[in-house]
């Protein structure tokens, strides 16, 4: 099972997209994020395995079965924790770059 520190920004992006657009296909998600369909499939399967996302079948307008991706309550909590982790990481990177720039100006 993945630890909260092992999730990637792609996992986080996918959780946000699924929360707002549960009927999107993996292909559409991949196009929106600019990553491969295989990567999206891998991330979604990982999120399903840890219980952050559930899959439900639905019948779409073309008489085919599709999936609805549902962010679980556990997934909603994890999404906030992962987002906070990335925010802290980005803040640290910003401060490091800021210090490099100001040190080189001195």
Mark where each language-model region is.
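Short, cationic-aromatic polyanion-contact patches
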Residues: 2-11, 25, 56-80
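Amphipathic alpha-helical dimerization/coiled-coil segments
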Residues: 77-106
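Pre-recognition alpha-helix immediately N-terminal to the DNA-recognition helix
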Residues: 12-16
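Alpha-helical residues within the helix-turn-helix
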Residues: 31, 48-49
């Amino acid at each position: 099972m993945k630890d909260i520190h092992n999730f990637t920004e792609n996992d986080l992006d996918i959780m946000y997209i699924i929360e707002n657009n549960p009927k999107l296909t993996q292909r559409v998600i991949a196009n929106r994020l600019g990553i491969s369909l295989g990567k999206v499939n891998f991330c979604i399967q990982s999120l399903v395995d840890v219980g952050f996302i559930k899959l439900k079948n639905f019948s779409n307008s073309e008489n085919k079965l599709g999936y609805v991706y549902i962010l679980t309550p556990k997934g909603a909590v994890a999404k906030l924790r992962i987002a906070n982790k990335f925010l802290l990481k980005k803040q640290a990177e910003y401060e490091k770059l800021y210090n490099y720039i100001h040190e080189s100006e001195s």
